[in-house]
Amino acid sequence: MLACPAQAYTKDPETGVVWIDQNKCIGCGYCTWACPYDVPQEEPNGTVSKCHFCRERVEGGKGIPYCVEACPTGALAFGWTKGGSSPDYLAPPDITRPNLVVIPPREGKVQASPIKVKSEKNYWELVAFTLLSEVGLLYSLASLFLKLHFAPLILLLTFAAGLLPSVVHARMTNRFHRVFLNLKSSWLSREVGSGGLTILLALISLVIPTLFPVAVIFAAVSVASSIMVYMLRARPSWYDADTPISFIGTGVTTVLPVAAFLSGSRLLLPLAAVVLAAELYSFYNRRRKLTLYVKLGNYRLLSALAMVVDLLSILFLPLAIAGSLISLASEVLHRLNFFKFVTYYGLPNDTQPSVRSKQETQSISKV
């Protein structure tokens, strides 16, 4: 509920049942990222739906969910419960605190893992927006302290080129205006809202330059919100220190060498090298933790090469451009793999295998 930018989720205060208003859903799919139980599902019509426990029957005491009524073994129950359980084959319950009780089998143990692997769909616009916004922000920040030209125009172009195509990521584009409705709790609303204001203020600052620092502030808010959008506990491969380090590092490692070349400030080059070293450390630390699930390549070695080139640029400044381009290549590959190899919490099943083999066992679930 808190993640939905369009306020399409509603919770019944009496029964606790949560459902999605199909007339409000914009189809961005962010709730499918945030849920660790595979409950929200994308529909062919562009919206997202979820089980709502047949709320038309539950409301007013007209009946119980059809699945509970139809289950021939009585394995399902619906009603008020006290306490809960956290079996190791489900996601940690403190992520969403679900009203779910799972009774494990009396004998044996369920051999399954809730961690699964997949590739995110339609992620090119997300790659473009995150990379371009980070580069635009850092160039604009640097321009406040160094003699860098065309900063308002670059900020406008990078955010517009990144944000506008990302509109299509919300499949119900005719309702995209709803993405701004949940600024109170949705990082996605904050990301898009502040990004939109950045574009507007950058455009105005072409005529009124004094507004440019305000545009930079909103750009910083947008990038910070972008980081938080992906810091989801339901997705362990994203919920990692490498995410903020790489998102911030993208701008630093690609922009500072260029800024050093344009301004003649060689002191920026060691700073870029330090950030590259931090990116290398965070990447290989993340890679080590994900080895069980996915095999990430050694493309981040490009960052090591960029670090060497940046340091050599202190002696021969034109090399800084090469260092920036090498860093950009490393960042693009890293961001592509960020979306291509995703580990997430879900329900172990046969259609999307979990990372550990499962054993056929019986369990009883009470909802």
Where are these regions (language model features)?
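Membrane-interfacial helix termini and the short, flexible loops that connect transmembrane helices
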Residues: 15, 114-120, 141, 177, ...
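N-terminal signal-anchor module of multipass membrane proteins
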Residues: 94-99, 103-149, 153-156, 340-344, ...
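Flanking helices and flexible, charged tails adjoining ferredoxin-like Fe-S electron-transfer domains
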Residues: 24, 32-126
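Composition- and surface-driven signal marking solvent-exposed, interaction-prone regions
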Residues: 82-83, 88, 322-326, 341-346
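Long, contiguous internal "core" modules enriched in hydrophobic/ aromatic residues
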Residues: 120, 130-135, 145-150, 185-186, ...
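Juxtamembrane/interface segments at transmembrane-helix termini
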Residues: 170-173, 333-348
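Membrane helical hairpin/interfacial module
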Residues: 150-201
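Ferredoxin-type iron-sulfur electron-transfer modules and their immediate structural context
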Residues: 1-18, 22-34
